[in-house]
Amino acid sequence: MKNKNSGYDLVIFGAKGDLSCRKLLPSLYQLEKKNKLCTHTRIIGVGRANWDKIIYTNVVYKSLIKFLNETIIESIWKKFSSRLEFCNLDINCLHNFKKLKQIIQQNNNIIINYLAMPPHTFGNICLGLESINLNLEPTRIIIEKPLGSSLKTSININNKIGKFFKEKQIFRIDHYLGKETIQNLLAFRFSNSLFYYNWNNKFIDHVQITVSETIGVEGRFNYFDTVGQIKDMVQNHLLQILTITTMSTPIDCHENSIRDEKVKILKSLRPFNINNIHKNVILGQYTSGIINQKKVKSYLDETNNQEYQMNKYTETFVSMKIYIDNDQWSGVPFYLRTGKRLPKKCSEIVIFFKTPPLNIFSKNYNTLSKNKLILSLQPNEAIKIYILNKKPKLTSQYKLDLITLDFNYSKFYKKIQLSDAYEKLLLESMKGIQSLFVRRDEVELAWKWIDSTLQCLHLKPRLPDLYPAGTWGPARSKTMINNDGYEWNE
């Protein structure tokens, strides 16, 4: 058993990949800057490149220059770079893993294996780690969602990993769970009686969850074209946001208490059928248009590869109306929306509260505006509450204005630099805390519901509705919510 107070060896498989360069290395540098890395912690890049420590250090430095968004501090870099090691290793050659063992044996650190590679490589990596006893506790393994492309493939991947690692060793990352606003949602809901007692179908009218992007497929067309927005975003992020928004009160803040409640929500999701699927699930695909005052191509023209024909059935946008069939949420519609090439980058949860049963201001207002709570996840983490307030006047006549109570994280906590989601998740993995990570049954229940939804779409196929880049998706998305008497929060 390794000493809990020792440092960590973070072994990154896929050391020169996009995830490592864009997210992991900048986050680790920030943890160094904040003095959060243990003294003896090392960062060991693994890849087939014929590199040594010096070459890898130069590669890391260039990556930080490109993705850090701030000037590298020489003293921090000196300390950070001293942690770097590189292991030239082909994961398809079992005997190559002895090279990694030689590096690992140099100290008494706890091992954290980060598989920043495609899921089809996980089996070979786990087999190699077992061959050098790097699958034994307290060793941990981090893997990125989405896992698989269906329930069947997800089970297959989880079985491969589960053959070598126990569930308490496996950390499945959904980076949205590392966002401050998502974590604060638990505190917001369960520590404030103002919302604790009103978070149900008696007081909440409907809920909207939007995750929008201005970018297109950004060179990921080989992956995205076979997956689409439902598998890439709804299964991966939106269902996690939905479960945290709607879960019942856990008995405590223990990781399994929280995840048990999320699982109950996933089990309560109402499935679609072939008769209502196209009424409640709207698919779209962007055509050419204007984003940030620049012309952009249509989805079908995204690739310059003449040998590859983009799929006209692949959705780049989806909106859906979901119901949760339990006592707390029965009858409350949840509108989910996510897409590419939309007008702005935005992730938010919008809670609309019911109006009072008796309108005493009916003489001047036939209907009252609904109170609205907006939890903004990105680009600016914030909480806004919209309430009605009397406008000051000399007369006794009531003029009501919709005013905003605004809380912005960065403005309120001026002296605290908000951490990137990956910083928090990496630090939690080092502590061995799994509450911000996804349990196996969560992943598989999400895939079960997604598979059922996709099966209905396949049984009643239709091409995605087209929408110009720079707009909020197909017209039918607005029609869907307008028919219920609501409008998208834009």
Swiss-Prot record:
One of its GO terms (molecular function) is glucose-6-phosphate dehydrogenase activity. It catalyses: D-glucose 6-phosphate + NADP(+) = 6-phospho-D-glucono-1,5-lactone + NADPH + H(+). Transmembrane segments: none annotated. It is an enzyme of class 1 (oxidoreductase). The keyword NADP applies. NADP(+) binds at R48, D90, I91, K145. One of its GO terms (biological process) is pentose-phosphate shunt, oxidative branch. One of its GO terms (cellular component) is cytosol. Pfam families: G6PD_C, G6PD_N. The active site is at H237 (proton acceptor). InterPro entries: G6P_DH, G6P_DH_AS, G6P_DH_C, G6P_DH_NAD-bd, NAD(P)-bd_dom_sf. Keywords: Carbohydrate metabolism, Glucose metabolism, NADP, Oxidoreductase. Pathway: Carbohydrate degradation; pentose phosphate pathway; D-ribulose 5-phosphate from D-glucose 6-phosphate (oxidative stage): step 1/3. Substrate binds at H175, K179, E213, D232, K340, K345. PANTHER family: GLUCOSE-6-PHOSPHATE 1-DEHYDROGENASE, GLUCOSE-6-PHOSPHATE 1-DEHYDROGENASE G6PD. Catalyzes the oxidation of glucose 6-phosphate to 6-phosphogluconolactone. Belongs to the glucose-6-phosphate dehydrogenase family. This is Glucose-6-phosphate 1-dehydrogenase. It comes from Buchnera aphidicola subsp. Baizongia pistaciae (strain Bp).
